[in-house]
């Protein structure tokens, strides 16, 4: 292991132990020693962002390295990617456009990134980048999906729909592709949209059970809140996740030994099985995968502060997804902080709005298909929202 890699390992170990100041100092030393060290820059941006939520501060060392070496295309590409990750999609788009005029632009996979950076700012450019990538990579499903996304953003859903339908025929259970197809069908008025977004059939759930060892649900939730609070140690949202103005736990809660957290996965069994029983049989993407059992595939907690929200997203690795509010106000009537469904997490022309809202209720588990666009409406005042979420996959 070289000295540069040793510094990164040291910084990651310090961060795992909660010594963020020391970890940041080590990473700053690493990028100043090797300004072209992309991994060290990425770790530093991630660390500063999660501590401050300040895009300029997070990018400062990398921006300085790019100014010092403007011909270092690897540094410039990393800068473009990370600008998007810290919420500066405008600067990311500009950086990608500049890079597309260099040899980096000859890489079709880089063109895909440039297309996704452009969709919210210049859909025409997004289509051009995506079409170039798809032409260079015939048969590449990801390139085809990027082209379809760009067409939806450009108001050309009639062209995008058959493109994504061809992909869906090859990967009929891909949750991201299902979400994209549903978006195209909604834009074109295709009745198949309602087969996928049947909210009455597919959005359900119920109160979790009172786990053994607790007298009632309120007492259990108090202990669960305390257990989760010990895990929410970062100051702001993680890079690459859907959380804004909040924190998300780093590790899989399934592996957390805390008794209150482990009890949660027993407590959700009752509403999960009731939901599966109510689904019934069918040949749609949800029911056709239904088995007698299920498996939880990853679980995490989110703590949203006032002003926080989830951007609209789907869960590509799931079959069914969930949200269970552990702590939330129960009296709001203005939908602030409510779970919402149906608003795509990608630009479309015309813009599509949410169609279904779910009021938070502590202890209530909400289940829905993993391909269904969902997020939370922003809230500016009042208490925080603390949730646990997980994905389900079919089990024996």
Protein language model regions, located:
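Structural register within alpha-helical repeat arrays
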Residues: 10, 44, 79, 113-114, ...
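Catalytic core of non-heme Fe(II) oxygenases with the double-stranded beta-helix
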Residues: 259-269, 273-367, 372, 377-378, ...
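Structural motif corresponding to the intra-repeat A-B loop/turn of tetratricopeptide repeats
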Residues: 17, 51-52, 86, 120-121, ...
């Amino acid at each position: 292991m070289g000295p540069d890699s040793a510094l990164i390992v040291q910084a990651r170990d310090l961060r795992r132990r909660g010594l963020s100041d020391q970890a940041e100092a080590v990473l700053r030393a690493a990028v100043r020693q090797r300004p072209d060290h992309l991994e060290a820059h990425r770790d530093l941006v991630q660390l500063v962002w999660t501590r401050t939520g300040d895009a300029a501060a997070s990018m400062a060392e990398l921006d300085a390295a790019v100014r010092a070496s403007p011909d270092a295309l690897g540094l410039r590409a990393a800068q473009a990617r990370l600008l998007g990750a810290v919420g500066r999609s405008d600067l990311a788009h500009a950086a990608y456009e500049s890079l597309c005029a260099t040899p980096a632009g000859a890489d079709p996979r880089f063109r895909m990134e440039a297309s996704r950076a452009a969709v919210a700012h210049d859909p025409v450019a997004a289509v051009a980048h995506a079409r170039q990538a798809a032409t260079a990579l015939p048969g590449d499903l990801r390139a085809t999906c990027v082209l379809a996304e760009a067409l939806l953003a450009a108001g050309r859903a009639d062209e995008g729909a058959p493109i994504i339908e061809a992909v869906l025929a090859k990967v009929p259970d891909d949750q991201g592709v299902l979400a994209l197809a549903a978006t195209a069908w909604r834009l074109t008025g295709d009745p198949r949209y309602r087969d996928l977004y049947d909210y009455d059939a597919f959005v359900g759930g119920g109160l979790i059970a009172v786990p053994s060892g607790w007298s009632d649900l309120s007492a259990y939730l108090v202990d669960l809140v305390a257990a989760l609070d010990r895990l929410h140690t970062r100051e702001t949202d993680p890079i690459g996740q859907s959380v804004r103005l909040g924190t998300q736990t780093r590790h899989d809660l399934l592996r957390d030994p805390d008794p209150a957290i482990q009890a949660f996965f027993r407590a959700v069994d009752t509403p999960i099985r009731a939901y599966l029983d109510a689904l019934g049989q069918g040949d749609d993407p949800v029911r056709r995968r239904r088995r007698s059992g299920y498996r939880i595939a990853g679980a995490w907690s989110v703590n949203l502060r006032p002003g926080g929200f989830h951007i609209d997203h789907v869960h590509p690795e799931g079959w069914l997804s969930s949200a269970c509010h552990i702590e939330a106000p129960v009296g709001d009537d203005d939908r602030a902080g409510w779970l919402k469904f149906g608003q795509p997490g990608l630009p479309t022309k015309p813009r599509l709005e949410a169609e279904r809202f779910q009021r938070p209720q502590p202890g209530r588990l909400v289940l829905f298909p993993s391909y269904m666009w969902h997020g939370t409406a922003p809230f500016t005042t009042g208490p925080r929202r603390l949730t646990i979420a997980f994905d389900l996959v079919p089990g024996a």
